[in-house]
Each structure stands twice: as structure tokens, then as C-alpha cells.
Amino acid sequence: YSSAASDVYKRQFNRSARDNIMYGNPNATEKDLIRSSRQAEAHEFIQDLEDHRGRKGYDAHLGEQGVKLSGGQRQRIALARAILKDSPVLVLDEATSALDSEVENSIQNALELVMENKTVLAIAHRLSTLAKMDRIIVLSDGQIVEEGTHKKLLKINGLYRQYWDKQSGGFITTEQAAE
């Protein structure tokens, strides 16, 4: 059994960007490292990194718990690590919470490929992260109150639908989102 988690803050080390990502799979090749970084939308900003000792790109150190990175950058490093690990079980804990909408959309598209043929446990308050999942379980006060696909949950007009309507803010109709 093997799993990968996109645990954003607690697993960033004061090591290089390369070491932080390769932690997911120490035997991975440089090509694998770059591929996973690109899929996580991290490659571009990693290339621009420079630490206080002049180390650049993938060799730049990130600081303790990734302190030198933004929340979104830390998230993308953690996602790159999870992608590189390529486990049959993937745990996404608020995987897109610190990302702007454009990067979130790109990562969601990449995650669709990564999640294929895997068991994914996704914890999310941003419901757009869950919309393409095969099965969504809605919890309230520690109890399962609804379950189904995004489309089914929108139709039953319950708690999930209420949250979806609040988050979509009327920019798109619920019917458009269900298509």
C-alpha cells in the first residue's frame, strides 16, 4: 500500500526545490522531476528561484517549511511531490485552496490525468475541486448527509447545492454547472 498526500505546509524542508519534490520518489529521474513540476504548475516559478547563497532554480533552498514561498507556491511543490510519487491512493487536502483561479484551473486539468485509475480522497471547501469526482460525500457535523456525483448532488437541492450556489455567486447557473 502506498499513498501520496498534498500536505501543503508541514512537509516543506529547508532543502532545495529538487529535494522537496524528489522526497516523493527519490529514485525518479530529472525528466520525471520536471514532468511532475510542470503538471503541478510549479516549473516556471521554480526556474526563477534564487536563495540567499545564490543557488538557483531547482537547487535553490526553500527555507524552513517553505517560508520563502507563497502559499500557492508551497501548494504546487507539494502537488509536484504527490504527482511524482504516483501512488494508487492520492490524498488531496485542500489541494487548490491557496491558488488563484487561473492556476487552479490548470492544476485541476492536470489532476484529472493524475487521478485516473487511482483512489482519491479529496478534502475541499472549494467545490469546483470536486466537480469531476466519481463520488462526492458531503459531511455535516461528522455525519454523511449526502453522496453522489456533482450532477446528482446539484439535482437533490441539499447542502451541497446550497454551498455550490453560494460559491458560484450567480455568475453561472447551477444548470450550466451540471452540464
What is each residue range found by the language model?
Residues 6-7, 15-22, 31-40, 56-157:
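ABC-family ATPase nucleotide-binding domain "signature/switch" substructure
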Residues 155-179:
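C-terminal boundary and immediately downstream tail of ABC-type ATPase nucleotide-binding domains
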Residues 48-51, 73, 141, 164-165:
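Short loop/turn and capping residues at structural boundaries
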Residues 39, 43-55:
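Conserved H-loop
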Residues 1-9:
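Single conserved hydrophobic/aromatic residue that forms the stacking wall/gate
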Residues 34-38, 47, 161, 165:
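Generic alpha-helical structural context detector
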Residues 26:
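Cationic, histidine-enriched alpha-helical/coil surfaces that engage anionic ligands
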